[in-house]
Structure formats: structure tokens, C-alpha cells
Amino acid sequence: MTVRRAAVADAGALARLRHALWPEGPVEHHRGELDRFFAGSQAAPVLVAEDRSGLVGFAELSIRPYAEGCETERVGFLEGWFVVPAARHCGVGRKLVAAAEAWARSVGCTEFASDAEADNESSAAAHRALGFEDVGLIRCFRKDL
């Protein structure tokens, strides 16, 4: 199993993985986002984990000026992280996050953060297993004007 930066040729398989993590809307929506990503500057990478069967996971990264519980103004952020069920508990997620942290360090970040839905206990457990600490739960609100 290898971890590498996603390439244009990965867009179809990566769109399906993104849809498994974020199922709202069709796979084509994710494909469109990826097409725009690959056509743009790619300031932050998408990492993919690949084995003989194809892509088995991904990690989408960014730099944020603020993240809950962080003290610096340039925080490496794990925007999305997914491993197919058949490849879980085999070190794939750990390798993706290690590569993500290495990238964040390489661009000058000294903190790395992530988030998850408040009721997603499996994600919370996975984050904790990789050394993340809980820094709080928030509720977000909106209304039409």
C-alpha cells in the first residue's frame, strides 16, 4: 500500500470515495469539485492510499488561519479523511494522516487539526488513536434572511 498525491487520473475513483464519506448529492457533484481542484492551483494536496485493488482511502488537506483549540494562525487541517471499510484497521488511515502531517510540517505548520460530526464516535476514536485530542464540541446555526 502506498500513499501519494492524487492525480487527475484518480478523479473517478476519488469521487466515489468522497461520495462514500459525504453522500449528500450525486457522485457527479464530487467529480465536478475534483475537476475544478485539478484545474486550479492545488495549494493543498489531496492524498490517496492505493493498493493492488486501487484507491482505498484519501485525505484532503488545507491550511486554515484558525482551528478550534489551536494557537497559531497557520494550521494544517484534515478536511476529510476516509478509508474503505475493507481496509480499515490495517494502518491505511495512520499512513494517510502521517503523510498529511508531514506535508503540514513541510509548509511551516506547527499544529494540525481536524473535525468530525459531534455524534460520529468512530471518527472520534480514530482521531484519538492517532494522537488528536478533543478540544470541544460546537453547534453551528443558520437562518434565512
Placement of each model-derived feature along the sequence:
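Conserved beta-strand in the GNAT
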Residues: 48, 54-63, 77, 82
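Conserved GNAT acetyl-CoA-binding A-motif
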Residues: 97, 104-116
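Conserved acetyl-CoA binding element of GNAT-fold acetyltransferases
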Residues: 72-85, 139
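Helix-loop element at the rim of GNAT/NAT acetyltransferase active sites that forms part
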Residues: 15-29, 69
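Conserved beta-strand-loop-alpha-helix junction that forms the acyl-donor binding cleft
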Residues: 113-123, 142
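A short beta-loop-alpha structural element at the N-terminal edge
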Residues: 2-14
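Active-site rim helix/loop that mediates acceptor-substrate recognition in acyltransferases
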Residues: 26-47
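Conserved acetyl-CoA-binding loop-helix of GNAT-fold acetyltransferases
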Residues: 79, 83, 89-102, 125, ...
